[in-house]
Swiss-Prot record:
Superkingdom of origin organism: Eukaryota
Organism in which the protein naturally occurs: Sorghum bicolor (Sorghum)
Disulfide bond listed as a keyword: no
Assembly and oligomerization: Homodimer and heterodimers.
Major subcellular site: membrane
Similarity field: Belongs to the Casparian strip membrane proteins (CASP) family.
TM helices/strands, residue ranges: 46-66, 96-116, 132-152, 187-207
Residues in the Extracellular compartment per record: 67-95, 153-186
Pfam families listed in its UniProt record: CASP_dom
Protein's recorded name: CASP-like protein 3A1
InterPro entries referenced in this protein's UniProt entry, alphabetically: CASP/CASPL, CASP_dom
Length: 211
């Protein structure tokens, strides 16, 4: 057999082993892992700023319109002229609406200023889940408060416009149209502020559900 001679083969496969005293250490390449607090929706921060800004504007409009709703008129009943003086401060429901609109506007303004401060420092708008939970709680509280205030004021405005059935109490909005119109627009703005605060709460939930 010519292929084997003197204990050697014609084709030799050599394997070089490391010396006995040497140590081989395999160092894996380090993988750079970067984490970012930005949620799955990159424009979610822009939507959050927009909803809070609109909620603040609606609350300010509700407050300013209700405060300016003052008017004097004359109501004629059976030929008797009765002077009327309509003012938002005469009703506890309208006072509650003004107070809650002011508080809601201040809350939204504080959140916008905080977001602007973080934008200047180039830090995340919502740095932690705890902060997101606080935002969610605040948005929920003020949204429900604006709904409650708007509903109470709407009951008073509807009573002024329609009067009381089965009684001789007339429609006060006929001699006081400006007061009733401003009150109605103010109440509508309050409900819009409630809607945008509720939208902010939904955005907070989306932020919390982000990985």
């Amino acid at each position: 057999m010519g292929s084997i001679g003197n204990g050697r083969s014609d084709s030799v496969v050599g394997i070089q082993m490391p010396p006995a005293g040497s140590k081989m250490v395999l160092e894996p390449e380090a993988l750079q892992v970067t984490t970012s607090p930005v949620p799955r929706w990159p424009r979610l921060g822009v939507v959050m700023v927009a909803t809070r800004a609109v909620a603040m504007v609606m609350a300010l409009l509700s407050m300013s319109l209700m405060v300016s709703s003052k008017q004097r008129g004359i109501l004629t009943i059976f030929g008797i002229e009765i002077p009327l003086d309509a003012n938002w401060s005469f009703s506890y429901s309208l006072q509650f609406l003004v107070a809650m609109s002011t508080a809601s506007a201040a809350y939204s303004l504080a959140q916008l200023l905080l977001i602007a401060h973080k934008a200047v420092k180039k830090s995340p708008i919502v740095p932690s889940r705890r902060h997101a939970w606080l935002l969610f709680a605040g948005d929920q509280v003020f949204s429900l408060a604006m709904m409650s205030a708007g509903s109470a004021a709407a009951a008073v405005a509807n009573l002024n416009r329609t009067g009381i059935r089965h009684t001789a109490l007339p429609n006060f909005c006929k001699p006081l149209p400006r007061f009733c119109d401003l009150s109605a627009v103010s109440i509508a703005c309050a409900f819009l502020s409630c809607v945008f605060l509720a939208a902010s709460a939904v955005i907070d939930v989306i932020w919390l559900s982000s990985p």
